[in-house]
């Protein structure tokens, strides 16, 4: 009995759902998917092209931070010497 009910429910659901979607809507959604895939591909190319610039900027920022940290360290040493004298 459960099997017959399950099969009947599946057949009924299939019949009902097949009438809910028209071909125009499916084609529009397929077109939207293609457009989005093209945009994703362009963005991936842009990211790949920018990656070397990002690494260069990070490297320069790290060098600048290292110089500033060293400068702060020596400034602190000078201050300590002044107060120690």
Swiss-Prot record:
Disulfide bond sites: none
UniProt signal peptide: 1-19
Keyword Ubl conjugation attached: no
Pfam families for this protein: LPP
UniProt keyword annotations, A-Z: Cell outer membrane, Lipoprotein, Membrane, Palmitate, Peptidoglycan-anchor, Signal
Main location: membrane
Lipid-conjugated positions (N-palmitoyl cysteine): 20
Cross-referenced PROSITE patterns: PROKAR_LIPOPROTEIN
Lipid-bearing positions (S-diacylglycerol cysteine): 20
Source superkingdom: Bacteria
Protein's membrane topology: Lipid-anchor; Peptidoglycan-anchor
Cellular component terms (Gene Ontology): cell outer membrane
Cellular localisation: Cell outer membrane
Protein name: Uncharacterized lipoprotein YqhH
Lineage per the UniProt record: Bacteria, Pseudomonadati, Pseudomonadota, Gammaproteobacteria, Enterobacterales
Gene this chain is encoded by: yqhH
């Amino acid at each position: 009995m459960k099997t017959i009910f399950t099969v009947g429910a599946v057949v009924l659901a299939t019949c009902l759902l097949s009438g809910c979607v028209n071909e125009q809507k499916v084609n529009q959604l397929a077109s939207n998917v293609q457009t989005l895939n093209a945009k994703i591909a362009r963005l991936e190319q842009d990211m790949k092209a920018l990656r070397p610039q990002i690494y260069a900027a990070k490297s320069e920022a790290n060098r600048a931070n290292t110089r500033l940290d060293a400068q702060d360290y020596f400034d602190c040493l000078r201050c300590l010497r002044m107060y120690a004298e």
